[in-house]
């Protein structure tokens, strides 16, 4: 699949080997062993193992599923039907359980010699992860689901001891706000398993959709799973048979599927189906745009609590996981404050604030789940709202130091901070990134990898790490229509673009001790994994070329030395500020330019798969006092009469508070007129500032001021202002937004 490669492979190998400081045990023939996540111990020995059609797979009787999995993966790519030998002591590849030799859960020992392969695990999970390591030793074509011809199926001789540092290595997939079909979920599980992640948080319920069949309440999926008009409705759900199939698929791959049944908030899809679940009983529609509904599950009605018991009973019977996720985030408590039934419960339980009702409800559910041998998991709000006595597990997404509170209150924690592990944020601000969440700064691959996980509370309370992929951007946008005639599911491609390669960074953060992590080493190994992702048909985000050096010359120019972030890929570049294409000049030696902002370079994997360019954003440090750069106008955009100018400010509006918007005239000879400014949350008008002001070179700044008191994370914000050129259209300028009060 990697047909578009340069002739510079050896040159790049030398550059990367010099640039990366590799551990001693990886130094021998390091190009052959590039494992992710990095094992605890690797010792390379002499020789290679060669797989052949006569190779056999022997296994302990308890490992039949893992043996059949290995047989299937090797069979698809080699075309060979390798023979399985149950309870065999002699086989080419031998899978055995021996807790005495491997002392840690999910640990394994892998011995590859020219004569054969021995894989020993403490448990089935360890065997499965040993298989994943073994597959990474074979050529990347091993991941193809079609027979690959002309491949030498060779693995280097090596001894590997390995085990995870943390028991919880998770990923959340949001199928509620956008429905992914069963086959895509299987592919997602495959990709998680490939990199030794073992927990899939299945976000099945949200305001925008109910995705789990509950037989006692059929309208949840008949009504709550669909949005939009009948002729163009969107949505879907998983039958209970679908769920059983996914669970079985995950079990072989050591992926535990944990259902998330959201309450008390994010439950509008259920309220649409059964209005009596809410405090008001009002009829709603399943939203086609993301927002946080004020409607909550009514805590004061026995009928609502019985609904919750019934749904959780069916869910627990369906999912064998020892955990059940109850969500619990972002509740707005005004409905409970206004509800007579909820107020009665508050009085009965001696609660002072409506928010404490959430703690009361969490206690009720946690006790119910404890009786069913389940542990409740939820977002950190579940132990921050009220006094929760029964131990729960909190997903720390907002403030990592809340792990301290979890410990103090007798709970455990999983780190999934939005600042590092929310994969619906873009990796960069480079123009050309696809539509993404913007209420926080981008999360680069390096930032994801740099997350610290043991600085906030005793290690025993932090079970591990989890990444999250939210799908609310799908229901904002129009760029994700499926292209049927090309057989292209753009929504699935979009999900993979945001998840990969950051999932590989998450894998290593979750698996390895913090002291064993090194980003340069990881980046080197990662460069050899993209071709493996290609053979898995994964639509990953291609990383930009790596700037190894950027040195000034004696003449004041700048010399760029680059290396490809993807092994064997091309680098194409331009020096005039234009975006490179696959036909731009090929980078082979350092490039010198007079102005770095005119230098662009892209990584080209193949003619249809390439990166965004290296991009140097303009320097706005001189305008720091005005806040964050938001937009600009140029002569081409200037109209001769007052016309609404609309631009997005999502991310710059970051919470409730008072903001200023400054329009700064930077160039031109004629004045620029500004009129009334309006702030929108999606299509809802939040603020309007009537004003008429003229700015020019002598009086270059116009400032507007407004207050936001109904902020919603994940919701797009826009500014619309009347603007025009006065006696001409030669002006240019910048717009900045500053939050001045909380």
Regions found by a protein language model. Give the residues of each.
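Flexible, acidic glycine-rich loops studded with aromatic residues
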Residues: 376-381, 388-392, 398-559
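Contiguous, structured surface segment used for ligand recognition
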Residues: 28-166, 510-520, 528-530
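Active-site neighborhood of glycoside hydrolase catalytic domains
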Residues: 285-288, 292-390, 397-405
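Feature activates predominantly on carbohydrate-active enzymes
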Residues: 102-323, 339, 364, 368, ...
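Extracellular carbohydrate recognition and processing domains
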Residues: 622-654, 686-706
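Bacterial Sec-dependent N-terminal signal peptides
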Residues: 1-32
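Short, compositionally stereotyped local motifs that mark structural "simplifiers"
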Residues: 27-30, 58, 523-628
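Short beta-strand-plus-loop segments that form exposed binding edges in beta-rich domains
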Residues: 663-669, 721-727
């Amino acid at each position: 699949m990697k047909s578009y490669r340069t002739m510079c492979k050896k040159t790049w190998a030398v550059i990367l080997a010099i640039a990366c400081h590799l551990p001693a045990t990886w130094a021998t023939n390091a190009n052959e062993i590039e494992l992710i996540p990095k094992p605890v111990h690797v010792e390379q020995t002499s020789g290679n193992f060669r797989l052949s059609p006569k190779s056999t797979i022997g296994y302990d009787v308890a490992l039949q599923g893992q043996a059949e999995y290995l047989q299937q993966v090797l069979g698809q790519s080699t075309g060979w039907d390798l023979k399985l030998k149950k309870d065999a002591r002699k086989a080419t590849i031998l899978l055995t359980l021996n807790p005495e030799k491997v002392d840690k859960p999910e640990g394994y020992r892998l011995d590859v010699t020219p004569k054969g392969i021995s894989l020993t695990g403490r448990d089935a999970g360890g065997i499965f992860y040993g298989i994943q390591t073994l597959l990474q030793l074979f050529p990347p074509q091993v991941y193809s689901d079609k027979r690959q011809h002309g491949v030498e199926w060779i693995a280097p001789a090596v001894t590997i001891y390995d085990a995870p540092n943390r028991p919880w290595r998770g990923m959340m997939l949001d199928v509620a706000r956008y429905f992914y079909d069963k086959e895509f979920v299987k592919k997602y599980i495959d990709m998680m398993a490939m990199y030794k992640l073992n927990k899939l948080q299945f976000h099945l319920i949200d305001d925008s959709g109910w995705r789990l069949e509950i037989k006692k309440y059929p309208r949840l999926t008949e009504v709550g799973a669909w949005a939009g008009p009948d002729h163009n409705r969107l949505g879907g759900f998983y039958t209970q048979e679908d769920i059983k199939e996914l669970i079985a698929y995950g079990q072989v791959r050591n992926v535990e599927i944990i259902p998330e049944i959201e309450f008390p908030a994010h439950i509008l899809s259920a309220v649409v189906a059964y209005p009596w679940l809410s405090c008001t009983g009002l009829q709603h529609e399943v939203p086609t745009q993301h927002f946080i509904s004020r409607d909550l599950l009514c805590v004061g009605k026995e009928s609502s609590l019985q609904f919750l018991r019934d749904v959780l009973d069916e869910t627990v019977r369906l999912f064998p996981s020892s955990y059940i996720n109850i969500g619990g985030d972002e509740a707005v408590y005004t409905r409970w404050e206004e509800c007579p039934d909820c107020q009665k419960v508050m009085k009965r339980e001696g609660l002072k604030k409506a928010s404490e009702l959430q703690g009361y409800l969490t206690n009720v559910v946690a006790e119910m789940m404890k009786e069913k041998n389940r542990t409740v998991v939820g977002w950190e709000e579940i132990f921050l709202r009220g006094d929760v006595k029964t131990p729960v597990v909190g997903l720390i997404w907002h403030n990592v130091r809340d792990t301290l509170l979890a410990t103090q209150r007798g709970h455990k924690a999983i780190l999934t901070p939005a600042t590092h592990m929310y994969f619906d944020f873009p990796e960069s601000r480079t123009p050309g990134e696809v539509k993404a969440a913007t209420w926080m700064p981008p999360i680069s691959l390096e930032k994801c990898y740099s997350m610290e996980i043991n600085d906030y509370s005793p290690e025993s309370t932090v079970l591990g790490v989890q990444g999250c992929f939210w799908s609310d951007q799908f229901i904002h946008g129009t760029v994700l229509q499926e292209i049927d005639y090309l057989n292209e599911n753009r929504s699935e491609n979009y999900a993979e673009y945001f998840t990969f390669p950051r999932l590989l960074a998450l894998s290593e953060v979750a698996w390895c001790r913090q002291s064993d992590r090194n980003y340069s080493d990881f980046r080197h190994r990662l460069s050899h994994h993209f071709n493996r992702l290609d053979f898995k048909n994964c639509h990953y985000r291609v990383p930009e070329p790596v700037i190894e050096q950027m040195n000034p010359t004696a003449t004041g120019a700048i010399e760029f030395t680059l290396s490809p972030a993807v092994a064997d890929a091309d680098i194409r570049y331009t020096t005039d500020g234009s975006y490179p294409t696959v036909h731009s000049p090929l980078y082979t030696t350092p490039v010198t330019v007079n102005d770095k902002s005119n230098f662009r370079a892209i990584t080209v994997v193949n003619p249809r798969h390439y990166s965004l360019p290296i991009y140097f954003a303009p320097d706005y440090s001189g305008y720091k006092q005005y806040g964050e750069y938001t937009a600009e106008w140029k002569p081409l955009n200037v109209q001769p009469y007052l016309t609404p100018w609309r631009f997005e400010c999502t991310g710059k509006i970051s919470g409730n508070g008072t903001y200023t918007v400054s329009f700064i005239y930077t160039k031109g000879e004629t004045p620029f007129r500004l009129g009334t400014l309006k702030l929108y949350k999606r299509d809802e008008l939040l603020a309007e500032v009537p004003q008429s002001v003229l700015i020019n070179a002598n009086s270059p700044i116009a400032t507007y001021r407004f207050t936001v008191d109904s902020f919603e994370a994940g919701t797009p914000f826009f500014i619309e202002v009347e603007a025009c050129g006065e006696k001409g259209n030669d002006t240019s300028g910048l717009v900045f937004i500053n939050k001045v009060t909380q």
